[in-house]
Amino acid sequence: MGKACWPKDRQGRRLTWLGCLFVAVTAVVAVFAVIFRPASHTDASAPAQATHPAAERASPTRSASHPPVTWQVAGPFADLSVPLAGMPPVADPANIYADAGPDMLSPSVRGVPYRIYVPDSGGSTVTVIDPATYRVIGTYQSGLNPQHVVPGYDLRTLYVTNNQANSLTPINPRTGRPAGPNIGVDDPYNMYFTPDGRYAIVVAEARQNLDFRDPHTFALRHRIHVTCAGVDHIDFAATGAYLIATCEFAGRLVRVDLHTLSVAGYLNLPGAAPQDIKLDPAGRIFYVADKNHAGVWLINAATFKVTGFIPTGPDAHGLYPSRDARYLYVTNRGNGTITLISFATRKIVTTWRIPGGGSPDMGNLSPDGKVFWVSGRYDNVVYGISTANGHLLARIPVGPQPHGLCVWPQPGRYSLGHTGITR
């Protein structure tokens, strides 16, 4: 599709890709069928999940016409089990989030006021909330179509990704205000940081690029073009050796070798619209929210193959580990619910329902883990939810289409980006 007819807004891109999804998937499957290696969909450590249509289609015991498929691209690649040099050591191999427990604040963020920064993606502002009073205390200009508020690797600066303005707005969390002029970068839908802190990764969704940039100047250092539309969310292996990114409009995941900065393989999830992705505390399973199939895929971190599926709710979207790393919070944007999955059993523990409905999207926990703050994407509000019982504590009006809000400060030694994923 030529640049002249490519929609500038995310909704337009979504409609365009949905319109040609069937043709594109059919063509890709036909061309590459000879090199695909079907994945094994069983894992002795994972409980069976066959109660949902998506899980049934993925089961090898059924005649699925397009089962999940993993394939590699031309190498050679580094050994992905080798830790990334320069990454802070993992304190507890059984829990990669061990250094991000309740109130485990780094010296870099001690004394920083507790605030919620909300990008109003339907406009060009960031709304700032004082969670102690449930009140908006400031609204600041950012740039057109702000999508996420992203903490820097060193925890000292927040960055607003102004998607259609091709810029980042730096915010000083000690003052809660913009900290200088906008920084020009191409198509910043989302942003992450490599576990060694060497690069910022600007997720250029419309361009299908992962742009590796200097984490301070944001000068471009390396670019990876991925052959899947809608690349938008990322998480990293426990070793830091690779990342997995979701491609929403292509129904595909891509694995990138961080030793060599090259694509190491793809995983097809036919009919899926993968959203957020999160690694379990043990570093063994990536959970992938799937909007289309209303649930969460389980991907074996070592083999890059599907091991199960857990139905959660319509428009499954955001994924956040509890502060004690026992549960995964799944936001189901389509029916106003939040599902809790046990990391230990890989089964649903409970589901919380927002009174009167809602559209929970992206958010994060309070530093002590007692409140889950999440944007109401289509209701122009922010929800505060008690993690003790799921009760709604607050419903705070904000700007149009609030998206990837950032709760700050967060516990942890360093930030991997997004809305405040720390380890």
Sequence positions of predicted segments:
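N-terminal intrinsically disordered, acidic low-complexity segments at the extreme N-terminus
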Residues: 1-3
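N-terminal Sec-pathway targeting helices
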Residues: 8-23
